[in-house]
Amino acid sequence: MSKVCIIGTTTWGITLGTIIAHKGREVMLWARTEDEAMLLSTQRRPADFLPENYHFPEFMNVTACLEEAVAGADMVLLAVPSQRMRPNIRLVAPLLTKSMLICSAAKGLEIGTAKRMSQVITDEISPDFAKNICVLSGPNLAMEILKGLPAVTVLAADTEKTAKKAAKLITAANFSAYTNTDIIGVELGGSLKNIIALGAGIVDGLNLGNNAKSALITRGLTEISALGAALGANPLTLSGLAGLGDLIATCSSNLSRNHFVGVELTKGRSLNDIMYNMSNVAEGVSTTAVAYEMARSMDLEMPVTENIYNVLYNNADPKEAARILMDAQATHELAGRKWNLFKMFRKRKARKTPELNPD
């Protein structure tokens, strides 16, 4: 029987464990304390977990012993907040073997380094195991998946062989996995879309309508593609499941934590108050800060990100930020066959309509 070790008793970690265990594979969840492991093992569910009728499937168990959790695993799947990825992979690294896949299911960028999660993992494990790193990302709202509703995801790795091996372990009824070798694009799509989801929450909180939200999502995708291209991603990846697909799901659903934060900001609540009272992490808050600094250092114009940053960190009025975003100047909107997204978003002193590259 195949075995998957999941690091992180988060909502997403438990959801992924449930998917995998329902397929008849052994899943071992690692809990950080004996008390947590005992409680989860006894109740077979988290105390505050929804839906109410949820219980761990037969082949999913919990342990506080990291060695027991990792031993014999075909994959170690890290479903932890992005700012906790480095300390967790440091604990796991000495227990890895050359045959184990190491999969990140986190959607964020590390504060201070601006690194993607696969880069953080690479920093902390033996170079001999780097070929086994993969990432999971896509339009995956946990509560829908736990209700048995269909969803798809993307498994990305540097090689198609590794991506397919990971996808085979993850794929189950109502949860299909596509593969991709553009690990940069898949990770950036999953991370950066959370910024736009914050904006979508603001638009919804202000009751600005679907026209405004569709404009925000579309311009947000252009920003994601511009930054992604500058960092080495394939822009086509960002129009796929891990980019546009995840963007639509997160911006359209009340189940999204980042969308929730955006809505609450329009009610006059402070960011600290919102975050303090949330049981889960809204990754978009930290990702906005990282992406904002990256854009500045690369001289990339990212107006959506800049305005969301000002709302989060400079106490800008959400209503004024939305007005600025909807009051764009008449510039070229098309991305043609030979359009250079990086140059298109380079800041220009004279805001002229950019010219298409000649044939």
From Swiss-Prot:
The keyword DNA-binding does not apply. One of its GO terms (molecular function) is glycerol-3-phosphate dehydrogenase [NAD(P)+] activity. SUPFAM superfamilies: 6-phosphogluconate dehydrogenase C-terminal domain-like (SSF48179), NAD(P)-binding Rossmann-fold domains (SSF51735). InterPro entries: 6-PGluconate_DH-like_C_sf, 6PGD_dom2, G3P_DH_NAD-dep, G3P_DH_NAD-dep_C, G3P_DH_NAD-dep_N, NAD(P)-bd_dom_sf. The active site is at K193 (proton acceptor). Pathway: Membrane lipid metabolism; glycerophospholipid metabolism. Its main location: cytoplasm. Keywords: Cytoplasm, Lipid biosynthesis, Lipid metabolism, NAD, NADP, Nucleotide-binding, Oxidoreductase, Phospholipid biosynthesis, Phospholipid metabolism. Signal peptide: none annotated. NCBIfam families: PRK00094.1-2, PRK00094.1-4. PANTHER family: GLYCEROL-3-PHOSPHATE DEHYDROGENASE (PTHR11728), GLYCEROL-3-PHOSPHATE DEHYDROGENASE [NAD(+)] 2, CHLOROPLASTIC (PTHR11728:SF1). This is Glycerol-3-phosphate dehydrogenase [NAD(P)+]. It comes from Dehalococcoides mccartyi (strain CBDB1).
